[in-house]
């Protein structure tokens, strides 16, 4: 029987964990997206031309009560369609990471569900007690982006 937690099981196949670091309050999971190509969000053409890399820091759901961040080594791709307005774009992992987000989708979904059951300020207080860093105003913006009803 294994006595360690295998974090890879909690992440999509396209994401590979390269390193895990931690301190008393936070866990940092360094990951890389292992896709060979990416689809342009504007025209839908798949591209294999990697333009560059950059690091993103995204908040994920807490692990064992600690604030958890994904440090994503992401690729920027060049669109192969000459008639497309987009020259470069970043890779997404559908249903998990969005190019514009500072949180994983599951973290956003949890916060939205909590906000719809309580209130934005109340859910922000609950999130802070769980070591999820957010505010009532951020939750309102998140609900608007997801086009969920505000109560």
Segments (PLM) and residue ranges:
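Short, positively charged, Gly/Tyr-enriched micro-motifs
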Residues: 58-151
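Short, conserved DNA-binding cores of transcription-related domains
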Residues: 1-92
């Amino acid at each position: 029987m294994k006595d360690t937690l295998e974090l890879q099981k909690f992440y999509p196949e396209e994401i590979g964990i390269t390193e895990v670091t931690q301190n008393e309050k936070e866990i940092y999971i360094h990951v890389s997206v292992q896709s060979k190509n990416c689809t342009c969000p504007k025209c839908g053409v798949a591209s294999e031309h990697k333009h560059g890399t950059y690091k993103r820091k995204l908040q994920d759901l807490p692990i064992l009560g600690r604030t958890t961040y994904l440090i994503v080594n992401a690729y920027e791709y060049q669109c192969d369609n000459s008639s497309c307005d987009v020259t470069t774009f970043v890779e997404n992992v559908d249903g998990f990471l969005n190019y514009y987000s500072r949180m994983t989708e599951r973290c956003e979904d949890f916060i939205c569900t909590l906000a719809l059951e309580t209130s934005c300020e109340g859910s922000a207080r609950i999130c802070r007690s769980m070591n999820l860093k957010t505010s009532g105003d951020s939750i309102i913006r998140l609900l608007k982006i997801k086009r969920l009803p505000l109560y």
